[in-house]
Amino acid sequence: MLILPATTVDFFLAGLEAFMRRSGQGTHWGVTVLQLEAKPDAQTLTKAWEEIHAQHPMLGARLKRQWRGWRWVWETHGTIAAPPICWHGVQGLPPGEEVIQERLQGRSSSGALTTPLWLEVFPWGTEGGHVILLTWRHALLDGTGINLLLEKLAAGACAAGPPAQTMPPRESMARIYKRAKPLTDRLHEMTSAGCLSAWMKGMPTGGRPEYRLIELSREESARATARLRALCGDFLQMPFYAAMAARALQLLHERRDWHSPEIHLHLPIQLRGRSRELIFGNHMGAMPLFLEAGALGTLDLAVAHVLEKYREGMKQERSQASEALTTLAAHLPLSTFIPMVRWTNMGQICSLFHSHTGSFLPGRTEFAGAAVQNIYTIPSVSAPPGLGIFVSDYAGLITVTLAWRGDGVSQAEIEALDRRIRTDLTGIAQE
C-alpha cells in the first residue's frame, strides 16, 4: 500500500463533492474537448493512455483520513488497468449537449463511469474530422493536471511515473490558526455586509449540469489578447479574466435586482511544486479576493480593481491564510465542511467559480498525429454558487464556458451574459 500526501484543495473538492451528492447534484466531473482535423493514430494514443494508467497509482487512489495525525492522504494499492478507449462509429455531427451532459453526470452510454478518466473518439462530418472527449474526475485533476495529461497523450508516451512525494512537516495548531485569522476576520466582515452568487436562499440546488460555449473567432481572440496585454502585461492573465467574470456576475445581479456590495472571488494560485510528471491531485490553491461592486463599472476599471486587490492579497499573504484556514477545516468530518462554509457565508460558498485553464499544448499543432483545431474544457459546477465561468486557450483561440445547474440561470440571462463577455473581451459592443 502506498500513502501519498493530499493537499488542502483535495480536501475542499472532496467536501464539495460530498455536498453535491447530498443535494442531488451528483459527482464532480469535467470534460475536455479536442477538435481534430483527422483521425488520431490509434496505436500512439492507446500506448500513451495505457502508460498513464500503468505509471500513476493516483488513478486508483482513495482520499482517506489517516487516524495517526488526523490528516487526509491518498491511499493506493497499486495501479489500475486503463479502460479501453471508446472509438465511436461515423456520425454526421460532433457529440452534442446531451452526450456531454451525460459525461458531466459521470455516465457513459453503457452506464456509470467507474474510473476517473474516460476517453472517447468521435468521427464527424464528411472531411475526416474527429472529436475527442476526455472525461475526468475533478477530485483527481484540475486545469494544470489536464494540461499535463494532454501533453503526455500528445507525445504518445508516459514512461516516467510521478516523483517521490513526502508528507509535509507538521505545524502546531496555534501557528496555523494565527496564519488563518486575518482571512477569518475578513470573511466575517464580508458576510455581515452580504455577498450573493448566482444562487440565493430558496432557489433549487439540483438539476442537471448545463453549459454554453462562447467561441471567439481568431480575429476576436486576437482583439481579446491585445486588450489583455494592454491591461495586464504579457505574464499576468488571471486578473483580466477574473474581472470579466466578476462583471458578468454583476450583470446577473442587476437583471435580478439583487444587491451584493462585494463579490467574493477565488483567484487560482499555484500551490504545489511544479513537475511535468506530477499530474494527478490538485495543484492550485486560492487567493480570496473581495471585489467592491461599485468598482466594476467598465472592464478597464474592473481589471485595475482586481490588480489592486491582488496586490493587497499578496501583501497580506491571503493565499497562505486560505490554505491555513482549510487546514483547520480539514479536521472536521467531510460531510460537515461545506455546510459549515455556508453557515459562515450566509448560505453561500463563494460568488462564482472561475478559472483560466492556461494555454493547452503550447507549441504543439498535432495530437496523436492529427492536426488540432481547438481545445477547451467544460466543467460542472454546484449550486451554490450556481455559476462558473471558465476560459480555455489553444494557439491563441479563446473559448469561454458558462456552466450552471438546471433552471438556475434563464436562457435570457445566458444570452445577456454572452453579450457582456464578448463585449468585454473584444471591446466591441454586441447587439
Where are these regions (language model features)?
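Non-catalytic, low-complexity flexible loops and terminal extensions
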Residues: 1-15, 88-90, 127, 140-225, ...
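Catalytic-site-adjacent helices and loops of nucleotide signaling machinery
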Residues: 197, 230, 234
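Short amphipathic alpha-helical segments
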Residues: 237-246
